[in-house]
Amino acid sequence: QPEESVFFA
C-alpha cells in the first residue's frame, strides 16, 4: 500500500 508514502511525499 503506497498510501503511506503520501505522508512522506
Swiss-Prot record:
The compartments listed are: Secreted, Cell wall
Q: Does the keyword Secreted apply?
A: yes
> Highest taxon of the source?
Eukaryota
Major subcellular location class: secreted
What are the protein's UniProt keywords? Answer: Cell wall, Secreted
Task: List the record's Gene Ontology CC terms alphabetically.
Answer: extracellular region
Instruction: Kindly provide the name given to this protein in its UniProt entry.
Output: 42 kDa cell wall protein
